[in-house]
């Protein structure tokens, strides 16, 4: 039988002991289907949404959005309707909304699932940037070829449990 419960610790703290808004200050997640995490109909509002919920001052939000747009090279996605974006563009906006909050830990569920080869290369560069920034990145992914030179460890899952671990460094 698959495990149906467990405990998650981040920096030695059980995250169940903290309200979700506190956890979201240092852990950001991007779902496999970005549509399921959108709360707005335009890209600019979506990118700022998390910061608004954490009551960032307006100036800090503007600063973080500018940095996000520049770092992720997504100026072409600003000021647009979510409904006119491709799957890969939606994935980039979902990631940008998390990146703008600058969490120390990123949880990514199948981040390459909606992406073509060029967009996967963009994703790889973005992950490289996060690694250089000292961020922790946990990725659930079927396509691992693009991650091989980026990751420190790989854990293989089978039937809901870790079946193998490899150190890549």
Predicted regions and their residues:
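Catalytic Walker B motif of ABC-type/P-loop ATPase nucleotide-binding domains
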Residues: 106-109
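H-loop/switch region of ABC-family ATPase nucleotide-binding domains
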Residues: 141-142
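Conserved ABC ATPase signature
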Residues: 81-85, 89
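Conserved ABC ATPase "signature" region
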Residues: 59-77
